[in-house]
UniProtKB/Swiss-Prot annotation:
Species classification: Bacteria, Pseudomonadati, Pseudomonadota, Betaproteobacteria, Burkholderiales
GO biological process, any: DNA recombination
Gene name linked to the record: ihfB
Subunit structure comment from the entry: Heterodimer of an alpha and a beta chain.
NCBIfam families assigned to the protein according to its UniProt record, in alphabetical order: hip (TIGR00988), PRK00199.1 (NF001222)
InterPro entries assigned: Hist_DNA-bd, IHF-like_DNA-bd_dom_sf, IHF_beta
Protein name (database record): Integration host factor subunit beta
Free-text function comment from the UniProt entry: This protein is one of the two subunits of integration host factor, a specific DNA-binding protein that functions in genetic recombination as well as in transcriptional and translational control.
Domain of life of the organism encoding this protein: Bacteria
One GO term describing the cellular component: cytosol
């Protein structure tokens, strides 16, 4: 599901919401989540999951084109951990085909 599909589904599910308002709501939520992660905060949405930052240590990598060794610096990456309700809901789908767009 893309961001525009999420906005369309939100507007469809709540007819009192104008599509423009649904767009604003989704963008506001995503901006708030991005800002929180950018400042090192953890985000927890009960029943859905949590977002946090993981730190990846510096390492020596290889340039795939030349094969030369390259120093890859330390970096922080967002990490999502699904909540119990989400895990159970997804697990209940075992045996059903996965829909790929």
């Amino acid at each position: 599901m893309t961001k525009s599909e999420l906005i369309a589904r939100l507007a469809e599910r709540y007819p009192q919401l104008v599509a423009k308002d649904a767009d604003y709501a989704v963008k506001t939520i995503l901006d708030a989540m991005s800002d929180a992660l950018a400042t090192g905060q953890r985000i927890e949405i009960r029943g859905f999951g949590s977002f946090a930052l993981n730190s990846r240590p510096p390492r020596i990598g290889r340039n795939p084109k030349s094969g030369d060794k390259v120093m890859v610096p330390e970096k922080r990456v967002p990490h999502f951990k699904p909540g119990k309700q989400l895990r159970e809901r997804v697990d209940a789908m075992v045996g059903q085909p996965i829909i790929e767009d």
